[in-house]
């Protein structure tokens, strides 16, 4: 006689499966992205953000971002299994099948789109869908393997969140929101190129034409330094157009100076582990920069 399956015996399996699905959504990346969405929402209005677009917008955008991340896991499952940084992901390890990953990504993305379309506005729903396609299909499935400028071109999809937050509240485009997009668009190459330097051998092993693989590490270091200077200029644009005040100006200047210095060190004073230090600094740079935007908005404006 077969032994009945107990509820308690199935709990560990459920826990492992749930964690695997959650991991596929790249929660840390989505969390940073949602911060930029929130800032876009807050800067779009002079006072408090209306509750419905705030909650529904954050939920819908988070779901579609998680869907894009899951599709990234699905498309990259072969190369992920060959790289030390990613070999332990759910798909290469067989914790989730490709079919289930596709169903999960499609379901999550569809639900997110429905939430945005019905509870926020169609403009935000379609813009978020375009970002999903841009990241999951245009970048991951094509650009990543096609050109060393993959990060530069594909970075536009990842730079959209502040605009999505803005349109979720206002249902319209605004030049100020585009300035925030420009900041993230300019921030993306030095952020990813620093990681690519650290993981150059792994990218070369799986034939991904990241800039350090195709043009060499020294050329990439120069590009990182130049982009941090461009980023510093981009970060000043909100001040120049009167969008932000002195609180943001001071914070932005300090953060830009720090990023340029780290990039200069990488170029002229490199040592083991410095590329990853630059990569981590870039994350804090973006997070603190957008927190400064928020602080300035409520303290100065």
Curated annotation (Swiss-Prot):
UniProt cross-references to Pfam families, sorted A to Z: UbiA
Q: Name one GO cellular component term.
A: plasma membrane
The processes (GO biological process) annotated in the record are:
heme O biosynthetic process
Give the matching InterPro entries.
Protohaem_IX_farnesylTrfase, UbiA_prenyltransferase, UbiA_prenylTrfase_CS, UbiA_sf
- The transmembrane residues are 29-49, 51-71, 101-121, 123-143, 150-170, 177-197, 223-243, 244-264, 274-294
Q: Report how it sits in the membrane.
A: Multi-pass membrane protein
Annotated catalysed reactions? heme b + (2E,6E)-farnesyl diphosphate + H2O = Fe(II)-heme o + diphosphate
Q: What is its EC number?
A: 2.5.1.141
Per UniProt, the keywords (alphabetical) are: Cell inner membrane, Cell membrane, Heme biosynthesis, Membrane, Transferase, Transmembrane, Transmembrane helix
Subcellular location per the Swiss-Prot or TrEMBL entry:
Cell inner membrane
| Record GO terms (molecular function) | protoheme IX farnesyltransferase activity
Please give the chief subcellular localization of this protein. membrane
Gene3D superfamilies reported for this sequence: UbiA prenyltransferase (1.10.357.140)
Pathway listed for it? Answer: Porphyrin-containing compound metabolism; heme O biosynthesis; heme O from protoheme: step 1/1
What is the top-level taxon of the source organism?
Bacteria
Signal peptide per UniProt = none
Q: What else is known?
A: Carbon 2 of the heme B porphyrin ring is defined according to the Fischer nomenclature.
Function of this protein? Converts heme B (protoheme IX) to heme O by substitution of the vinyl group on carbon 2 of heme B porphyrin ring with a hydroxyethyl farnesyl side group.
Family according to the record: Belongs to the UbiA prenyltransferase family. Protoheme IX farnesyltransferase subfamily.
Question: What is this protein identified as?
Answer: Protoheme IX farnesyltransferase
Q: What organism is this sequence from?
A: Shewanella baltica (strain OS155 / ATCC BAA-1091)
**Lineage of origin:** Bacteria, Pseudomonadati, Pseudomonadota, Gammaproteobacteria, Alteromonadales
Question: What gene is this protein a product of?
Answer: cyoE
